[in-house]
Amino acid sequence: SLICFAGLSACSTENAVVSSLKTYDVSNSPCKRETTMADLQRQPREEENKQTKLSIELGKDGVAQCKVEDVKDNCAIRERVVNVTCEGNQITLVVHHKEHFEVLADCICMYNVDFKMSKLSQGNYHLKVYYAGSVVKYDKEQLVYDGEIRLVSGKVTQVTLRSGVPLPVD
């Protein structure tokens, strides 16, 4: 008789296949700081230039606790989600609006987006992070991070995203 073994592959540095890496338990903070567009153009406050950071803490179970801190977005848009793909050792995250908005507010807010990502192995990865609107189209203009990271179980890896870039509105 023929016996087949099928395995689920996690995104790892030893695996060159597309995996079933996924994000889940996405939550958005309330608006942390609000600035009107007029105020921002007249006199940008130092806090509005605060760098957006992505933190990834890899658990022993392969689940990563992630946070994008201080994402700039329109005040009318309350929910952002995160998509992930992984091929070989490249992880691509896309932070985007959950739904399309017809009416936008004349202000921007800073939000945090928390999510979990699984299953990951310890190791070195090439990470790309994009921002997108609700249509989820993105290119190099929306690339806010492109670099190498090392994930170690039980440790937080933090990267700084390109500053001053709000999520696009489509």
Regions found by a protein language model. Name each.
Residues 1-6:
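Sec-dependent N-terminal signal peptides
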